A protein has these predicted regions:
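Catalytic machinery of carbohydrate-active enzymes
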Residues: 1-239
Length: 239
């Protein structure tokens, strides 16, 4: 059996895009056990995907000591492949302990953050990323060296908790579209005028907006069609 570890601690948008690689891993390896290490508050999102065999929850309150203990436990799993989809100090510490030697198992792949391009875009407004930029593709590219090149997107067996299903089963309809207009970096956000135009272009659909309590601009999006747009900014959680 092949054992595969994915490292991605946060944030919600990146984790959801990274989840797109799971189908490709399972297609490439007939008998595979997939583990994922993430931040404690992201476990609820990943737990909805039944294709992940084990989720490791890192509590950042435990600091370096907690990370080192988790690294020691991960090393005992004897992984064949490790995919560092985060590339930060924490993930580098994990790799150093779990996979200390190059060119031997566990083999390691790294997703580049393309820091030079990020600096130019976020600080100087100069965009050298692919146009259009697709974050999901950036998570897929590093896996090509392992022969993982096809990523099925037909998974529908999401494991929503019963209380979530019962709470929203009458709220969600086939003509509903969910909008998630926020981002930590303002430059990553689509302009509000574009969201309002999208709502206007689809008069046959209802919309629900999901965002954080500080995203007050969502109310302006709702104003495009108050009878069809529900603003739940600040009223929901990750699970």
């Amino acid at each position: 059996m092949t054992k595969f570890l994915i490292i991605r601690f946060s944030s919600i948008g990146d984790i959801i895009q990274c989840m797109g690689i799971i189908g490709g891993i399972r297609e490439r390896f007939a008998d595979v056990e997939i583990h994922w290490i993430t931040r404690k508050d992201m476990v609820g999102t990943l737990s909805m995907d039944g294709r992940i065999d084990k989720i490791w929850a890192f509590d950042k309150e435990t600091g370096l000591a907690g990370l080192l203990k988790m690294a020691a436990d991960l090393r005992k799993e004897h992984f064949d492949y490790i995919y560092d989809a985060h590339s930060n100090i924490r993930s580098n510490i994990l790799k150093l302990i779990v996979s200390p030697l190059p060119f031997v198992k566990p083999y390691v792949a790294l997703r580049s953050k393309e820091r030079g391009k990020r600096f130019l875009l976020f600080k100087l407004g100069i965009n050298h990323f692919d146009k259009p930029f697709r974050g999901m593709v950036s998570f897929q590219k590093p896996l090509k060296k392992w022969g993982i090149t096809h990523f099925p997107d037909n998974y529908h067996d999401w494991c929503f908790p019963d209380e979530i299903r019962s709470k929203y089963e009458n709220f969600v309809t086939k003509d509903m579209v969910t909008l998630v207009p926020s981002a930590n970096w303002e430059m990553k956000r689509w302009p509000v005028s574009y969201w309002k135009e999208l709502v206007a272009l689809l008069p046959e659909y209802r919309f629900v907006i999901l965002a954080g309590p500080k995203d007050t601009f969502c109310e302006e999006i709702r104003s495009a069609a108050p009878e069809r747009v529900v603003n739940l900014a600040g009223q929901t959680s990750l699970m």
